Every structure is written in structure tokens, then in C-alpha cells.
Amino acid sequence: MNNNTTAPTYTLRGLQLIGWRDMQHALDYLFADGQLKQGTLVAINAEKILTIEDNAEVRELINAAEFKYADGISVVRSVRKKYPQAQVSRVAGADLWEELMARAGKEGTPVFLVGGKPEVLAQTEAKLRNQWNVNIVGSQDGYFKPEQRQALFERIHASGAQIVTVAMGSPKQEIFMRDCRLVHPDALYMGVGGTYDVFTGHVKRAPKIWQTLGLEWLYRLLSQPSRIKRQLRLLRYLRWHYTGNL
């Protein structure tokens, strides 16, 4: 068997993270032996680890997800520090989503999109069809009422979607995916946060050089100074990192 279809796991603060070497490894793992895996993909960064530490409900949600992977460079560095032999790299959630969509388009895999503003969702659908001929079997923007959730779950199930991506922010998207899987378990679910906004150009992502240097967080801070409180929270994570408490 190609060793790209398997991956080691590493533990940080009790979380079991998949160690992908690069994007190709991630894709080969998710499509092992030509069969798309089923379960829930959750991107893990330092901020999410802090949230998990302080919120038992969120911890339970994240722990239940089968595929937790290092989306943040700080998490990758922590894994490498704790496990010096680890061959793990950052796989950005936004990039992984695009690669999954490209693969889905190539193979005709049915996709259901959830979340985002109505106009952003419509633009996302159009771009996915035009760019990769993605077989979108249904969609729902993020503006639905709680009493409409069950009907939406049934609609997703009836669509036969094999990939369901949910852009509602954390922990809303994790709650949605957990509950939807009770009705439609046979799919790969992925929480994608603000990915639709980035994909359609409504939100600008850091230039590649900033991403390569692991400074995407700094670019976002300079672009949105209001994020300073969120960034200051990360000092706690840094303390864990440098004192070996991860």
C-alpha cells in the first residue's frame, strides 16, 4: 500500500492530530484506494486549542471529529517540538477545500454547500462549476432558522452528497455537522469558516510569501487591528509551547 494513504497521529493538549507531510499526502489519505473517506474534517489552530481548553462542549465536539489536522503554523511547530521526528506540515483549510473541490469536479463527486451570505454562496457555486465543473447537488446559505435545521438535514440526505462543506464559523459549524451526520452519515464533512468569502474575493488572504513564512496571522492583524485582543489570547498558547506543556 502507498504510504501516502496512511498517516501518523500526534497529541497536543489531549487532541489527536493527523500528521500530513503536505497537501498531496492529505489528498491521498482522504481518497485512499480511490475511496473517499467518511467523517468530519476539522482544522486546528492555536486559537481553537485555547477554545477547546476552556469550553467542554466544544472539546467534545472536536474530539468526536475523525480528521483533525494542523491548519495553523504554530500548531505545526508545536508538533515538531514535541515530536522531533515528525514529518508534518501545515495544510491550510482554505487550500484543502479548494483541492477537494477540484478533485470532486474531476471525479463527479456530489457536493452540498452550507453557510455564507446568499450572494457569496451563489458566487461560490458559480465559480466552482465554471472552474472545476463541480457537481453541486444542493446548497443553503447560513441564514436559516433553528426550526428549519431538520428539514435541511433531510434535504442533504436526499441529495446523496458525498462531500458537505459548512461555512458557519466555529463552533456552529461543528454542531451542525455533528447533528447532520445523524441523518446523513455517509459523507465527508468539512468545516470551512470564511473560506467561501476568500474564494470569491470578498476577503483578501495574505500573500503567498507571508503564508510561506508563517506570518499569515501578522498580515491579518495588520489588516484588521481589531484582532489584537484575539492575538493577545495566544500568549497563553505560547507559554504552553515554550514550557513543554502541550
UniProtKB/Swiss-Prot annotation:
Role: Catalyzes the synthesis of Und-PP-GlcNAc-ManNAcA (Lipid II), the second lipid-linked intermediate involved in enterobacterial common antigen (ECA) synthesis.
Task: Write the record's keywords in alphabetical order, separated by commas.
Answer: Glycosyltransferase, Transferase
Top enzyme class, one word, equals transferase
Family statement drawn from the similarity comment of this UniProt entry = Belongs to the glycosyltransferase 26 family.
Q: In which pathway does it act?
A: Bacterial outer membrane biogenesis; enterobacterial common antigen biosynthesis
GO biological process entries: enterobacterial common antigen biosynthetic process
According to the UniProt entry, its GO molecular function terms are: lipopolysaccharide N-acetylmannosaminouronosyltransferase activity
Q: Which reaction does it catalyse?
A: UDP-N-acetyl-alpha-D-mannosaminouronate + N-acetyl-alpha-D-glucosaminyl-di-trans,octa-cis-undecaprenyl diphosphate = beta-D-ManNAcA-(1->4)-alpha-D-GlcNAc-di-trans,octa-cis-undecaprenyl diphosphate + UDP + H(+)
**Enzyme Commission (EC) number:** 2.4.1.180
InterPro entries the UniProt entry points to: UDP-ManNAcA_Trfase_WecG, WecG_TagA_CpsF
Name this protein carries in UniProt? UDP-N-acetyl-D-mannosaminuronic acid transferase
